[in-house]
Amino acid sequence: MSGVSRRRLLTATASAGALGALSACSANDWSVSGKGDANASAHKRPAKLIGDGSTADTGAQPGQPKAERLKPGERPPQFVVFSWDGAGELSNKLFSRFRTIAAEHDASMTFFLSGIYTLPESKKHLYRPPQHPVGASAIGYLSDRHIHATLQQIRAAWLEGHEIGTHFNGHFCGTDGVRRWSPAEWRSEIEQATRFVTEWKTNTGFTDLQPLPFDYRKELIGGRTPCLEGQANLLPTAAELGWKYDASSPGGLQIWPGKVQGGRIWDFPLQSIPFPGHSFQVLSMDYNLMANQSNANPLGDRAQYAAWRAQARDSYLAGFRRAYESNRAPFFIGNHFERWNGGIYMDAVEQAITRIATHDDVRMVSFRQLVQWLEAQDPAVLRKLRTLNPGQSPLGGWAEFLGTAASPSDTAAS
């Protein structure tokens, strides 16, 4: 693939943003709530400050659904997870835009926060990336005002029921990137990302912001690596840290998820989905759509924007329909807060959310909420669900297919 590299593209986007140039449905007893005043309705009990007061233990997260085990013969709900890499609030206010959209459609999402988005550039000497010079980063540091705005968004998002995961720090891709890191180096990167989030008050000097209302070391149960690279050596560290899932697989199919790393980590890959007008499929992420539409050029032919926007939206909807009308495999869509090709991919995601939300049995959830549901199920049922291929409906219908548990000889869920 030629054109602008993903690393250069994300660096340019974040740097421009730092300068200010860039600008569900519920079913049964699973009601994904993101409602109310994020600052007023959160928790009645007093917050217990942690460390320097950057974070606080405020109790159970609001707006969390109760995971119920499927009844024999019951059709699974259609889970859809929208996740966001980086999760910084720049002048384009995309973080706040999609919080609003989520609230309008009773959706929870996962925001993979880049740790250095809470670290001022004046303090970049505190970041010691593996195999790179002190303070180095392939993405730009945010301006102080954008760090301030990002912290506000992270606080509000969590109080609305969204998940805060990690996108790590420096976003190093390619031959000298994270694919070369050892498990020990991944641990260093994770510890630094966590420290930047839990010590933002010390590092920024901000005194007008409330603490993030969660213990990040407990909140953090998964992430997505830069450019979907380096998963093999991340997984041992993730398992040691007690993480529940990883979303860094370089690509998967629309089947029910299983576990990796000896059955300790749920594997949630981006998925190959139909690409309208083509015989091949595309990975369910904005960057991959752009790579195929404008050869990874974020300033492609403006005359094509309307057609590309519709194609991106229809690709997401085709992926959704394939799962919804067949095996009901959870559908994963990944994105960045970006304005590539005039912002068409943000519009495409918004349009997809709006249309998906009109369907029955749809639950737009975070990865954390999906983990909780999966772990509430009969393992035999999950094994049986994993025997269904992309686009394959259960023989005889759901009542017959899940009327009895899978036999031990069925495909294992791990």
Positions of the model-derived regions?
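Active-site-adjacent pocket scaffolds in enzyme catalytic domains
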Residues: 36, 40-55, 128-144, 209-327, ...
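Active-site cleft segment of glycoside hydrolase catalytic domains centered on the general acid/base Glu
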Residues: 175-192
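C-terminal domain-boundary segment and adjacent tail
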Residues: 53-56, 60-64, 74, 110, ...
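N-terminal export signals
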Residues: 2, 8-27
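Sec-exported extracytoplasmic/periplasmic mature domains
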Residues: 103-107, 159, 195-202, 239, ...
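Active-site beta->alpha N-cap acidic-glycine motif
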Residues: 50-163, 170-174, 203-236, 252-253, ...
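C-terminal region of N-terminal signal peptides and the immediate post-cleavage residues
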Residues: 21-40
